[in-house]
Amino acid sequence: MKAVIPVAGLGTRMLPATKAIPKEMLTLVDKPLIQYVVNECVAAGIKEIVLVTHSSKNAIENHFDTSFELETMLEKRVKRQLLEEVRSICPKNVTIMHVRQGNAKGLGHAVLCGRPLVGNESFAVMLPDVLLAEFSADQKKENLAAMIQRFNETGASQIMVTPVPQENVSSYGVADCGGIELNGGESAKINSIVEKPSIEDAPSNLAVVGRYVFSAAIWDLLEKTPIGVGDEIQLTDAIDMLIEKETVEAFHMTGETFDCGDKIGYMEAFVEYGIRHEKLGKEFKSFIKNLAKTL
């Protein structure tokens, strides 16, 4: 199975930091955000990844490309550990492809841009703003990996969800599963997805997270999806049509998630990853503890 990662967005929520730097290249400790999402794909067994980019996102393409000059310099200076870290950015058995989204026509259109490279096959979609904490779940078995396994077993498209406080439901797409309660790692049929409902009208508190596994049927539906909210082709509209056509399931994620397209969410992720960093975590945690005493 291939994965499509739309990275063509302008990152306006993170301005001014993203004026000249793609939001996906903002660093979380010592790696850019996009690296964590690609690593998640690789851990789940995905070997072919399609990045849907924009002309302003060359830094992303360069990050996953080979840098002969850098590698030669590190080799000459016997910086073996750094050399291995640079070479591991894109594992040898993983292919990362790029396709441009010429016009900003929405998330549905961005996903559709990946069709020529994916082909008429099932595929995963990963929204790079959303980070699933690698320290809170086994990425080789849970979440995306489990969604793919569930899809392979049932043929039902999977949409990742997580519970949010009822007072926050109006900020999310919310899954209507007919009142069925889910635990982590479980799936249930979706009747509909309601975009940003009022608290009174929300069918549940299961918010869509930003991880999808779609059957190939979604491709033709995306082609037929009319212009929707914001004069854009909305992925949600295509999902609504898919739900009418075949079974689509909500998959309850395991562990923690961070919205790194939001400044507070990004800062929270930085602290959480910082205190757990293999080399820097101990010193950083000590700093945080001392800082907390002064607040």
UniProtKB/Swiss-Prot annotation:
Record GO terms (molecular function): UTP:glucose-1-phosphate uridylyltransferase activity
Catalytic activity: alpha-D-glucose 1-phosphate + UTP + H(+) = UDP-alpha-D-glucose + diphosphate
Alphabetic keyword roster: Nucleotidyltransferase, Transferase
GO biological process: biosynthetic process; UDP-alpha-D-glucose metabolic process
EC number assigned by the record: 2.7.7.9
Listed SUPFAM superfamilies: Nucleotide-diphospho-sugar transferases
Superkingdom classification of source: Bacteria
Similarity-based family: Belongs to the UDPGP type 2 family.
Function per UniProt: May play a role in stationary phase survival.
Name of this chain's protein: UTP--glucose-1-phosphate uridylyltransferase
